């Protein structure tokens, strides 16, 4: 008679020894040793071993059932004679009495195990198989747990979870919108963020809002980007930027304590945008290690090295970064290409021994006494010193990329901590777009200028500052926020500076300008990219590893083969004609 004692594979334990149980799951492997068959059956909780004796009527069925088939087994739990310490259930096995095949599996296209042989695109094509791997299941399960920790903290701190629409209005926010055609021959747009909605909720008096929001951006993809992604979106009324940052810090303290049982180093480090560029060559620096960029321009005032002399006289920059390791030539070639990819004309280097120059690409043309003074002043002893000489923006960008690469090519980089949070503050209000030949918002057009630049931001945009703040974790921007403009005249002035005329302002943003006429509180907020946070917390190589069904690096869903063509009938019904 069948038992009702259904047990998950990973939950077989000492309390069940001698009892009859039912387990249901997938066959990980089966092997015949003499007169016995050993079957490893797994489910989402783990693996358990099943033993089938030769005289058992299901012996041949078990032997012939392929891996990854779905089965049900009834049997008696007993202690194993040879314990497998790598398994949670390694002390136990199940003596099979009955066997049922639910679904027979074909041979999978790759090994379904953590150290799989499947390349990423193949695994994405068969994502339902990839998600059987324990590491992937843990990622997806932990995603839900971590999101719920964020939600729990915010609810406890009087934030209201409010959903905003997916079918929205097209707005110029820096990336391309996904447009949704309708039968009325008009279009919705999928939101790049709930920015305007959450500001309107502040006008509505909702005080503290949050949402686990889906966002959509049709832009170039990188290792840490997806066309659709999830944000923890937050907005508050009447709080200062420092008060918002304090809540955020407490939120991460709570999440990391609950998930990892660790105490984060607090308060989070603060750094101005200009210092981040000056010392790290990045607006999202990884501060787990030092290796700061050095301004060495003045050391070369009297050099005979023509390139550096020319840079000094033209009032450009000679910057350098040092690593306490002798970087091999093969890796130097990689760094040279990396510098060129970041607009530098070249990368010079010197090997330093005991505070003196020993060799390198410019060792024959640079004065040794200058290098010795640099080493003495900056306490450089043994390692490799890299130089870029160019315009300031280029030297910092190139050396910032090289500094970041040190982690991958040198084993001597000393990480000070596992998780290094950093607030980057004092942002410029605008950045200059070489492509558009004009100033654009560094964050978005709703960002409040600082009090010092409130009257001059549209006359002197290069020096305009924003009350904006980014949160960086281990060299990744995980969140960005600001205080918002809450005056309709100031908001209109901002739109006009950004190139919108009166009719465009009315068409695209008339609703928020009108809302601001009916009493709007000072407000501000922040939004966090869930996938980037998870990628760091769960130590994965890509955000695709923490999304159940992601797109690949080209924005293609290989499982569903989308984006895909649409029938002419569907296009005709929507009044759309595609150009060839």
UniProtKB/Swiss-Prot annotation:
Higher taxonomy: Bacteria, Bacillati, Mycoplasmatota, Mycoplasmoidales, Mycoplasmoidaceae
Keyword Nucleotide-binding: yes
Protein name (database record): Aspartate--tRNA ligase
GO cellular component, one term: cytoplasm
Family matches, as NCBIfam families: aspS_bact, PRK00476.1
Subcellular location field: Cytoplasm
Residues that bind L-aspartate: 173, 217, 443, 484
Transmembrane segments: none
Gene Ontology molecular-function annotations: aspartate-tRNA ligase activity; ATP binding; nucleic acid binding
Role according to the record: Catalyzes the attachment of L-aspartate to tRNA(Asp) in a two-step reaction: L-aspartate is first activated by ATP to form Asp-AMP and then transferred to the acceptor end of tRNA(Asp).
């Amino acid at each position: 008679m069948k038992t009702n004692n259904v047990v998950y594979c990973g939950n077989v334990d000492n309390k069940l020894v001698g009892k009859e149980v039912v387990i249901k799951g997938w066959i990980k492997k089966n092997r015949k040793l003499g007169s016995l068959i050993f079957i490893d059956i797994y489910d989402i909780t783990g693996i358990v071993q099943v033993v089938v004796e030769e005289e058992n009527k299901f012996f041949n069925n078990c032997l012939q059932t392929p891996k990854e088939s779905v089965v049900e087994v009834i049997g008696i739990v007993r202690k194993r004679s040879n314990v497998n310490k790598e398994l949670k259930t390694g002390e136990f096995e199940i003596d099979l009495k009955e066997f049922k095949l639910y679904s027979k599996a074909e041979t999978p296209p790759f090994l379904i195990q953590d150290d799989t042989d499947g390349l990423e695109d193949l695994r994405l094509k068969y994502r339902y198989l990839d998600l059987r791997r324990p590491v992937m299941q843990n990622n997806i399960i932990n995603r839900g747990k971590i999101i719920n920790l964020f939600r729990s903290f915010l609810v406890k701190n009087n934030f209201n979870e409010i959903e905003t629409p997916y079918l929205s209005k097209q707005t110029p926010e820096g990336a391309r919108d996904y447009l949704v055609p309708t039968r009325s021959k008009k279009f919705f747009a999928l939101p790049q963020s709930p920015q305007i909605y959450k500001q309107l909720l502040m006008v509505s008096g909702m005080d503290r809002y949050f949402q686990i929001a889906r966002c959509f951006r049709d832009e170039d993809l990188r290792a840490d980007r997806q066309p659709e992604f999830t944000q923890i979106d937050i907005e508050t009324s009447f709080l200062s930027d420092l008060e918002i940052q304090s809540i955020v810090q407490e939120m991460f303290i709570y999440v990391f304590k609950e998930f990892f049982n660790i105490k984060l180093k607090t308060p989070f480090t603060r750094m101005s945008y200009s210092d981040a560029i000056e010392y790290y060559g990045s607006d999202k620096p990884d501060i787990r290690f030092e290796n700061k960029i050095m301004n060495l321009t003045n050391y070369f005032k009297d050099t005979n090295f023509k390139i550096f002399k020319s840079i000094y006289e033209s009032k450009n920059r000679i910057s350098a970064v040092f690593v306490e390791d002798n970087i091999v030539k093969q890796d130097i070639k990689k760094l040279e290409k990396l510098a060129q990819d970041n607009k530098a004309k070249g990368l010079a280097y010197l090997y330093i021994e005991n505070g003196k120059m020993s060799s390198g690409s410019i060792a024959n043309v640079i004065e040794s006494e200058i290098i010795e003074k640099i080493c003495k002043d900056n306490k450089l002893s043994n390692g490799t010193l890299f130089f870029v000489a160019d315009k300031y923006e280029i030297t910092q960008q190139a050396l910032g990329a090289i500094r970041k690469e040190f982690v991958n090519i040198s084993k001597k980089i000393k990480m000070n901590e596992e998780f290094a949070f950093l607030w980057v503050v004092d942002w410029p209000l605008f950045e200059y777009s070489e492509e558009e030949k004009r100033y654009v918002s560094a964050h978005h057009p709703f960002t409040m200028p600082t009090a010092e630049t409130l009257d001059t931001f549209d006359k002197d945009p290069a020096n305009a500052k924003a009350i904006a703040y980014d949160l960086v974790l281990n060299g990744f921007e995980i969140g960005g926020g600001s205080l918002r403009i809450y005056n309709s005249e100031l908001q209109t002035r901002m739109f006009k500076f950004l190139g919108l005329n009166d009719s465009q302002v009315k068409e695209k943003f008339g609703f928020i300008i009108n809302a601001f006429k009916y009493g709007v509180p000072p407000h501000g907020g922040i939004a966090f990219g869930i996938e980037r946070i998870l990628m760091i917390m769960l130590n994965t190589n890509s955000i695709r590893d923490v999304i159940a069904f992601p797109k690949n690096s080209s924005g293609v869903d290989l499982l569903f083969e989308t984006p895909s063509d649409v029938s002419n009938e569907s296009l005709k019904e929507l009044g759309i004609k595609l150009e060839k």
